[in-house]
Amino acid sequence: MEDTMHTIGKVATLAGVSTDTLRYYEKEHLIEPASRTAAGYRLYNDEAVRRIRFIKTAQHCGFSLSDIQELLTLKRTDSACCEDVRSVAIEKRLRIARKLRVLQAMSAALNDLIQSCEGGAA
């Protein structure tokens, strides 16, 4: 079954991003148009829409565009195996755990500050 081809505006609407975001993703090699019209307009297939949604979800989960690029490259590469993807995911999880410890320490410090000011004295 052949994918439906979409203009950049339609893909932006379907994926919930701006056309500028799509152009940026293309510049960063996260996506690429499936083809171009005779006039040079970008045309994207349904896979591009899925890919953009994956990128946005991964960003929402805290992955950087660099992390996402690495995951997408692993997915595209025939030689990539589950172990490669697993290694990237483990490294990301470790970074998140480190950030979480820092945030917990900051939260504890803020709690101490709040408690020290509970009497209303300035």
Curated annotation (Swiss-Prot):
GO terms for molecular function: DNA binding; DNA-binding transcription factor activity; metal ion binding. Residues 8-27 bind DNA. InterPro entries: DNA-bd_dom_put_sf (IPR009061), MerR-type_HTH_dom (IPR000551), MerR_fam (IPR047057). Hg(2+) binds at C81, C117. It comes from the Bacteria. SUPFAM superfamilies: Putative DNA-binding domain. Residues 5-74 form the HTH merR-type domain. Keywords: Activator, DNA-binding, Mercuric resistance, Mercury, Metal-binding, Plasmid, Repressor, Transcription, Transcription regulation. Pfam families: MerR_1. Transmembrane segments: none annotated. One of its GO terms (biological process) is response to mercury ion. PANTHER family: HTH-TYPE TRANSCRIPTIONAL REGULATOR ZNTR, REDOX-CYCLING DRUG-SENSING TRANSCRIPTIONAL ACTIVATOR SOXR. Mediates the mercuric-dependent induction of mercury resistance operon. In the absence of mercury MerR represses transcription by binding tightly to the mer operator region; when mercury is present the dimeric complex binds a single ion and becomes a potent transcriptional activator, while remaining bound to the mer site. This is Mercuric resistance operon regulatory protein. The lineage of its organism: Bacteria, Pseudomonadati, Pseudomonadota, Acidithiobacillia, Acidithiobacillales. The gene is merR.
